[in-house]
Amino acid sequence: CKFDTYLVTGSDRAKTIEQVGLDIYNRCKRVFNCSGSDIYDGHNSVYRSNWKPSDELISFLNDELDYSNFPIRTGNHIEHRPGGINFSILGRGEGNMNGRDEYVKWDINTNERRDIASRLNDNFPDLNVQIGGQTGLDISDSDKSQIIKFFNFDDEVHFFGDMMEEGQNDYPLARAVKERLGKTYHVKD
């Protein structure tokens, strides 16, 4: 019995390959990087969104960065990706791993990312803002559920995700899979 494997991730192509390895990446029938805004079949790019953040959004995020009391900053706080951006108070720069555990604890105690997401949703209602990974927010004009259009109603889909609660970046796709195509599995580790 053979199943086709698809990978859906909030990360860009380079980070995805770093995370899963080139062998696994290439074994997937299709990889939906950047929540489906940058799509590859093997080495071939088949789609890339041209969405870009507004100056107003970038200014808002810089204000949030200034407002945060979290003491560790590693740089690269606004990472531009095809079809979206990732925003992180900690940052994605050198030394990111050193502060990651501290930020996770901080965010659990303060709900900082949830609060920033709420303010973003209030100020930019046309955007999709999701808590992604351990330290970031994924911001774009669409979410992971956009990939559902690549599947037929008779396809049986099994979706495994780790951020499947409402407001997290796997939630929209998990909801769409449950409604249309198959089963979801919440992965804890």
Where are these regions (language model features)?
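Alpha-helix C-terminal capping segments
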Residues: 1-3, 20-24, 64, 119-124, ...
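Short glycine/serine/threonine-biased micro-segments
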Residues: 8, 34, 130-131, 159
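Acidic, Mg2+-coordinating phosphoryl-transfer loop and its flanking beta/alpha structural elements
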Residues: 9, 87, 148, 154-189
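Short beta->alpha linker loops
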Residues: 11-12, 82, 143, 188-189
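Conserved acidic, metal-coordinating active-site core of Asp-based
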Residues: 71-158, 166
